[in-house]
């Protein structure tokens, strides 16, 4: 019985010494926070290891984070992960929904961005940009023939209407000469004709009779205008003039109209385009409503994929510019020692307890061995 009690005592003493020793060693990692002095001499192991090496710990943590944890390669894999891209697209959709739900108008948005009187400024900006755009376009095309400037569809449409235009002109002319105004015009022309011939003209007028002669001329004009040959000649004339006009350089048209009038027309058209409708004062969700489905289904996912690719291509420069190692170091150095201790303990509390228990276990085993050796001797 005495032997058992002796061995048990040795095991208990060894376990106590081992456990307390490891516990003190763990505590000395953090405590004391400040160096301790006795008779002007600093006690060894003060301050604790972590307070003493906090700067080195902060620098090492920063390097570890950049070199092994938050690396450019890891960030690139995350950015190019389809699930992350899909999540980014969903973020974009959610943000856009919240933004549209505010019922903000373009005018309110521009004013919130610091742009006062947005309608007037947009009109002036649109007019200026339109004039500059026309000037650039004119510099490129003004010496080219009009046939090269006109869109092919417009040119085909105009050419297809030349034939019908000839018939239209003939019919309108025929309608005019059939009217009372046209008849009076014919009568006036005949009278001037006879008057210009002097006495001979007066004699002819007396013989023929003005009224009957007007009716005859009117009838002949009608036959002439209805004749297919007349319309064919008119069509050829229109084709000739059309092709001649197509060969003119654009500068000729500018000179005919006047550059100042063209500039004024362009600026006026740009202003009317901005003024057309009340879109500046309509909620953005109403303006975007017709395009909402393609915007949410295609444009936002494409934008998310594009942003991911751009960030992935520049990730090394971004990480270097951010200075993650410096951020981690500065953050760790800004922690109080008590908070730093709490952080480390929250991570490794279980392991530190196991180290204490392991010290007690080893101390108990050593005590048992010592007890056996003592009994043997």
Curated annotation (Swiss-Prot):
InterPro entries: DUF445 (IPR007383), UCP032178 (IPR016991). It is a multi-pass membrane protein. Keywords: Cell membrane, Membrane, Transmembrane, Transmembrane helix. It is found in: Cell membrane. One of its GO terms (cellular component) is plasma membrane. The chain crosses the membrane at residues 7-27, 357-377. Pfam families: DUF445. It comes from the Bacteria. Belongs to the UPF0754 family. This is UPF0754 membrane protein GK0639. It comes from Geobacillus kaustophilus (strain HTA426).
């Amino acid at each position: 019985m005495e032997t058992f009690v002796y061995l048990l005592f040795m095991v208990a003493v060894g376990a106590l010494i081992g456990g307390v020793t490891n516990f003190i060693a763990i505590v000395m990692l953090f405590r004391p926070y400040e160096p301790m002095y006795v008779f002007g001499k600093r006690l060894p192991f003060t301050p604790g290891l972590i307070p003493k090496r906090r700067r080195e710990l902060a620098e090492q943590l920063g390097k570890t984070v950049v070199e092994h944890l938050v690396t450019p390669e890891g960030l690139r894999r995350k950015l190019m992960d389809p699930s992350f891209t899909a999540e980014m697209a969903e973020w974009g959709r959610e943000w856009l929904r919240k933004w549209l739900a505010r019922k903000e108008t373009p005018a309110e948005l521009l004013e919130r961005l610091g742009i006062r009187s947005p309608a007037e400024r947009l009109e002036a900006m649109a007019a200026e940009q339109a004039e500059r755009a026309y000037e650039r376009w004119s510099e490129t095309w003004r010496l080219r023939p009009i046939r090269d400037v006109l869109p092919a569809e417009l040119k085909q449409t105009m050419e297809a209407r030349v034939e019908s235009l000839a018939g239209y002109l003939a019919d309108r002319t025929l309608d005019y000469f059939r009217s009372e105004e046209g008849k009076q015009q014919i009568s006036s022309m005949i009278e001037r004709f006879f008057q210009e011939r002097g006495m001979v003209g007066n004699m002819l007028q007396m013989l023929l009779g003005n009224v009957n002669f007007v009716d005859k001329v009117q009838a002949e004009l009608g036959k002439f205008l209805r004749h297919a040959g007349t319309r064919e000649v008119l069509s050829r004339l229109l084709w000739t003039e059309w092709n001649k006009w197509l060969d003119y350089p654009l500068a000729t048209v500018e000179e005919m109209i006047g550059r100042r009038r063209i500039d004024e027309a362009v600026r006026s058209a740009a202003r009317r385009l901005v003024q057309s409708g009340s879109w500046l004062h309509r909620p953005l969700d109403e303006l975007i409503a017709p395009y909402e489905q393609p915007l949410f289904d295609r444009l936002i996912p494409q934008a998310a994929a594009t942003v991911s690719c751009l960030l992935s291509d520049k990730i090394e420069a971004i990480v270097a510019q951010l200075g993650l190692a410096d951020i981690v170091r500065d953050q760790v150095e800004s922690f109080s020692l008590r908070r730093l201790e709490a952080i480390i303990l929250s991570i490794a509390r279980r392991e530190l307890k196991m180290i204490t228990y392991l010290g007690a276990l080893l101390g108990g085993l050593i005590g048992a061995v010592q007890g056996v050796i003592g009994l043997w001797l």
